[in-house]
């Protein structure tokens, strides 16, 4: 990605944020500081006080595509679990400028290494990965984080087998027992939501799934062999 990464710092603790900004290389990071989180504002990373997150961002039905690092004043198990379940990172005070600078650098470096396209087109449809939304000629289809992760992996590897164990990695669930059956449930939901294109998700029984390039092609278990 060309140019410096945009980091939006949202807090009422201006000293911490200005000191952190001083530690970040301006050639690598462009920091803007404000006291209000604006959902429409584009940024590679939003660092925001939990108390300043808008209600809709905290709600379970909010879009989870925004990369947000949340700052907590104290540990609360329910809050921490909720944030993790929705894909947010968080830090708990005390937080120094050096700690915040290191967290920002680590977050953006890891996401650069594992970057995915912002959108993937299949047929007349466009899957907006970060927004967890598929735009179709009939309208918008909203996906859960797990459905989005599975569809992303299938489309990136279109026409190729995706093993069940790899699709399990896309399930956003912190339950101790995540079994192969979870993949089948999310696949069934995806097929319904994608309508006619749901039939492109082909089952290779006992092995995994693939997203077919050819809607007219019929697959069987023997069509793909593992090496």
Swiss-Prot record:
Keywords recorded for this protein, A-Z: Activator, DNA-binding, Transcription, Transcription regulation, Two-component regulatory system
Limits of the Response regulatory domain: 6-108
Impact after mutating residue 191 to A: Protein localization in inclusion bodies
Any one GO molecular-function label of the UniProt entry: protein homodimerization activity
DNA-binding region: 117-213
Consequence of changing residue 49 to D: No effect on DNA-binding or dimerization
CDD domains xref list: trans_reg_C
Disulfide bridges in this chain: none
InterPro entries cross-referenced by the UniProt entry: CheY-like_superfamily, ChxR_N, OmpR/PhoB-type_DNA-bd, Sig_transdc_resp-reg_C-effctor, Sig_transdc_resp-reg_receiver, WH-like_DNA-bd_sf
Top-level taxon of origin: Bacteria
GO biological process, any: phosphorelay signal transduction system
Function: May be a global positive regulator of transcription. Binds a cis-acting element of its own promoter DNA sequence and is hence probably also involved in its own transcription activation. The recognition sequence is 5'-WHGAWNH-N(3-5)-WHGAWNH-3', where W is A/T, H is C/A/T, N is G/C/A/T and the linker length in the middle is 3 to 5 nucleotides.
Subunit structure: Homodimer.
Protein name: Atypical response regulator protein ChxR
Species this chain originates from: Chlamydia trachomatis serovar L2 (strain ATCC VR-902B / DSM 19102 / 434/Bu)
């Amino acid at each position: 990605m060309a140019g410096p990464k945009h980091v939006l710092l949202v807090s009422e603790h201006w000293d911490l944020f200005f000191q952190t900004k001083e530690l970040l290389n301006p050639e690598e990071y462009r920091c803007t500081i404000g006291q209000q989180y604006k959902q429409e504002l584009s940024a590679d990373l939003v660092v925001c006080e939990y108390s300043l997150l808008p209600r809709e961002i905290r709600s379970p039905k909010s879009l989870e595509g925004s990369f947000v690092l949340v700052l907590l004043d104290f540990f609360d198990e329910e809050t921490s679990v909720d944030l993790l379940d929705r894909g947010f990172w968080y830090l708990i005070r005390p937080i120094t400028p050096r700690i915040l600078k290191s967290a920002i650098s680590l977050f953006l470096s890891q996401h650069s290494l594992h970057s995915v396209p912002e959108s993937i087109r299949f047929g007349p449809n466009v899957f907006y990965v970060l927004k967890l939304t598929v735009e179709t000629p009939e309208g918008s289809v909203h996906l859960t984080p797990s459905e989005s992760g599975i569809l992303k992996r299938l489309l990136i590897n279109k026409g190729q087998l995706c093993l069940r164990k790899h699709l399990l990695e896309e399930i956003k669930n912190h339950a101790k027992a995540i079994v192969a059956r979870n993949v089948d449930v999310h696949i069934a939901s995806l097929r319904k939501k994608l309508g006619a294109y749901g039939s492109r998700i082909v089952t290779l029984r006992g092995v995994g799934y693939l997203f077919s390039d050819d809607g007219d092609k019929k697959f069987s278990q023997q069509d793909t062999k593992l090496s």
